[in-house]
Amino acid sequence: MSRQDRIEMDERMDLKQKSDVSQEDRSRADMYNFLGLVLARPADEILLEQMSQLSGDQSELGKAVETLKRVSKVSKPNSVKIEFNKLFIGVGRGELLPYASYYLTGFLNEKPLAALRRDMVNLGLSRANNVYEPEDNIASLMEMMAALIVGRFGSPVSLGKQLKFFDKHIRPWAGHFFTDLEAAESSILYASVGSVGRLFMEIEVEAFRMSAEKSA
C-alpha cells in the first residue's frame, strides 16, 4: 500500500468517526478542545482573534462566552502572556496549580495522576511527545475528554465510559479550579475563561446526571 493510499484510508476512517458523532457531541468536544487550547499556553494573536469572533446565546454559558469575546477584543498577546505566567508559572510557582493531584491531595504527582495514567493506557490515550506537564493538568484533561467524545484515538467511546472518566478525573476538582481561575488576582482574560469553564462543567454534570437517570 502506498503512502498516499494510507493517507486516503486514514482520511476516510476519520470522516466515518466524525459521522458517528452527533452534532451535540461535536459541540461538546469543541468546547473541551477550546478550553484545553486556551489553558495549555498563553493565547497568541491568532487565538485572540478567533476568540473575538465567538458568539453566545442568552443562556448563562452564552453570556459568559460573550464576555470572553469582549475581553479578547481588547487583549494583547504580550499582556496575556504575562497574565498566564503569573497565574500558572510565576517565580517558583504560579498563583494556581492546575493539577488534579494538587486539588485533590494538596500535593503534585500523587495518586490521582497514577490512576489517570492507568486509565489512559486502558483507553488508548497517550501524552504528546512535546508535552512535559503531568497528564493530570486541566488542559490535558479537557483535551482527553474531547478525544474520547469524537474518537480521536479510535472509535468514540460510549456515554457511560465518558461519564466514568469525567466522574473520576474531572468532576471532583475542575469546577473548583475554574472558580479559582475566575477569582484569581492576576486573572483578566482568564477570569472570563474561568467563567466559561465553570458553567460548562455545571452543564456537563447535569447532562450526565440526566443521562444516568434515563438509563437506570
Regions found by a protein language model. Give the residues of each.
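Surface/interface-facing alpha-helical segments and adjacent flexible terminal/loop regions used
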Residues: 2-216
